[in-house]
Amino acid sequence: HSFPTRRSSDLVAQIGTKKISNIMGFYSIPDFMYNNRFSGEETILRFNEFVKKVEDKEKPDIIIIGVPEPILPLNKKHLFSFGIRAYEIYQAVDVDYCILNLLSGEYSDQFETEMKNVCKYRYNVDIDDFFVSNFSIVSNSLYSSELKYVYVQMNALPKSKNFFNADDLKDERWFNKIEARLKKYSMFEQF
């Protein structure tokens, strides 16, 4: 994909979900997020400190933070830490714009409403957009130790203006929407 060109003065810092994120030129979620060495409160405070250090070092216009696991368990075999990582991250930082990534599937207006409520009341974050990928879980891997994924043709997206997919990355509309929202926040930013 080609991404829209931005001003050379724009600086983005990214905290990725994989340990190998450093290879791609951005930060990785710290190891302490994955062990039980610290209490939940300590983990939240430490992650906040980590993000602050990134901010102080890079002085970015935007910090993109990937959440390393799904926000809800899939089944009894794949619990995804019950969304605890997401909870800790969302408590550690104030989110200006949140995009929830979804596997390929058919999504309704009711789904959008319910997921926004789950995120608002469980994680204290408002979902701005849903990004629907071209990947789906191979059904016979649901109960194996490792999930397998398959690339699928994109289903039609709901009529909601809050659903996007890879095709939307080919033009600037989605980026412009995000940029416009963030600019509104920056007008009222307090230091």
What kind of feature is each model-predicted range?
Residues 1-2, 18-21, 69-71, 106-107:
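Gly/Ser/Thr-rich loops at beta-strand to alpha-helix junctions
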Residues 9-13, 127:
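Hydrophobic anchor at the start of a short beta-strand
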Residues 19-40:
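P-loop NTPase switch/communication element
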Residues 27-32, 142-151, 175-185:
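Short, surface-exposed amphipathic charged segments that create phosphate/polyanion-binding patches used
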Residues 43-53, 62, 67-166, 174:
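Conserved catalytic-core segment of NTP-binding enzymes
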